[in-house]
């Protein structure tokens, strides 16, 4: 098994352990914790890509590693990480915590019915009258709630997380490769 794949699986395992830890501690339905978990997921992906690219570069720098090899290593790592995490999220939302989508839906619906949300919608309509011509704040709230139903389907969560992590992983691959070539390679 290549180093890129091992690195991806190790960092995906770290993220999954953190998610399971959140469930075991009892914070799995707190929306603020999911924002933090999203940040941890992004950080684990970044660290997986960085460790993979830098380690591969340092291991093979005497052979003259090309830029394409660095990018390929990073993208391979991010693809394995993304697929692993997307599958984990599918399993999580279908079998580990199947009531979470309904709980999250209720939290979002309650949020859309607050005065703060109403004031934000009214301000948005006022600032962009041509975009929201003929629409009321109730129409916008109903659209938000319809979008919530669509996004909380476990199959859609799988697809969205897979695509988002793949795109983010490619971006991280370019970023880490550039940083490695421009800064780290000059230092070492």
Regions found by a protein language model. Give the residues of each.
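Juxtamembrane interface at the cytosolic side of transmembrane helices
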Residues: 58, 168-188
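Juxtamembrane loop-helix boundary motifs flanking transmembrane segments in multi-pass membrane proteins
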Residues: 1, 59-67, 143, 147-154
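Alpha-helical transmembrane segments of multipass membrane proteins
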Residues: 14-22, 44, 48, 81-89, ...
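Hydrophobic secretory-pathway targeting helix
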Residues: 57, 67-93
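Individual transmembrane alpha-helix segments
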Residues: 133-167
């Amino acid at each position: 098994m290549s180093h890129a794949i091992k690195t991806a699986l190790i960092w995906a395992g770290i993220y999954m352990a953190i998610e399971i830890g959140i469930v075991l501690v009892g914070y799995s339905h707190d929306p603020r914790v999911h924002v933090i978990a999203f940040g941890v997921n992004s950080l684990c992906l970044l660290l997986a890509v960085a460790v993979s690219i830098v380690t591969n570069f340092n291991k093979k720098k005497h052979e003259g590693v090309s830029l394409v090899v660095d990018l390929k290593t990073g993208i391979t790592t991010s693809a394995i990480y993304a697929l692993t995490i997307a599958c984990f999220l599918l399993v999580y939302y279908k079998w580990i915590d199947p009531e979470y989508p309904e709980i999250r839906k209720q939290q979002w619906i309650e949020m859309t019915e607050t005065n703060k949300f109403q004031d934000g919608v009214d301000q948005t309509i006022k600032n962009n009258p041509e975009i929201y011509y003929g629409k009321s704040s109730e129409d916008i709230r109903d659209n938000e709630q319809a979008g919530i139903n669509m996004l909380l389907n476990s199959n859609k969560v799988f697809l969205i997380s897979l695509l988002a992590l793949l795109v983010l992983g490619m971006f991280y691959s370019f970023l880490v490769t550039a940083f490695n070539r421009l800064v780290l390679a000059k230092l070492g």
